[in-house]
Amino acid sequence: MFRIGQGFDVHQLVEGRPLIIGGITIPYEKGLLGHSDADVLLHTIADACLGAVGEGDIGKHFPDTDPEFKDADSFKLLRHVWMIVKEKGYTLGNLDCTIIAQKPKMAPYIEDMRARIAEGLEAEISQINVKATTTEKLGFTGRAEGIAAQASVLLQKV
């Protein structure tokens, strides 16, 4: 049996915060605003995994009203989500992600992101795809006001 999930997330770029995407800190003058570390890609992946097993979304599991998750490491949140997936008897088929950002360029960091995500999902790097695109300077991502991400996951019953 297979299950498919999809995720989407957006965070605003602001000064005074580190930029963490896919579990990797990227040197940039701005970072993403959020209750946790605001890792837009890991949040998207967590949502896709939760959706695939019918467990809602990260807001349900890690509410932004709970002080326990203030500045939380999104990699730890992803690991918790993956434990839920495993408890339900699933393993990763593959994951395909897209980061939508005008700036900074993501290409130099994608392989490190793939490795970190594979670690979090107990998978091979070959099961993880991360790509990046711009919106050709259109919309909030095009104006570099924020970063968005999308993910599709295929889970397989063990």
UniProtKB/Swiss-Prot annotation:
The gene is ispF. Pathway: Isoprenoid biosynthesis; isopentenyl diphosphate biosynthesis via DXP pathway; isopentenyl diphosphate from 1-deoxy-D-xylulose 5-phosphate: step 4/6. Involved in the biosynthesis of isopentenyl diphosphate (IPP) and dimethylallyl diphosphate (DMAPP), two major building blocks of isoprenoid compounds. Catalyzes the conversion of 4-diphosphocytidyl-2-C-methyl-D-erythritol 2-phosphate (CDP-ME2P) to 2-C-methyl-D-erythritol 2,4-cyclodiphosphate (ME-CPP) with a corresponding release of cytidine 5-monophosphate (CMP). Gene3D superfamilies: 2-C-methyl-D-erythritol 2,4-cyclodiphosphate synthase. This is 2-C-methyl-D-erythritol 2,4-cyclodiphosphate synthase. The keyword Chloroplast does not apply. The record marks 35, 134 as: Transition state stabilizer. Homotrimer. A divalent metal cation binds at residues 9, 11, 43. Its EC number is 4.6.1.12.
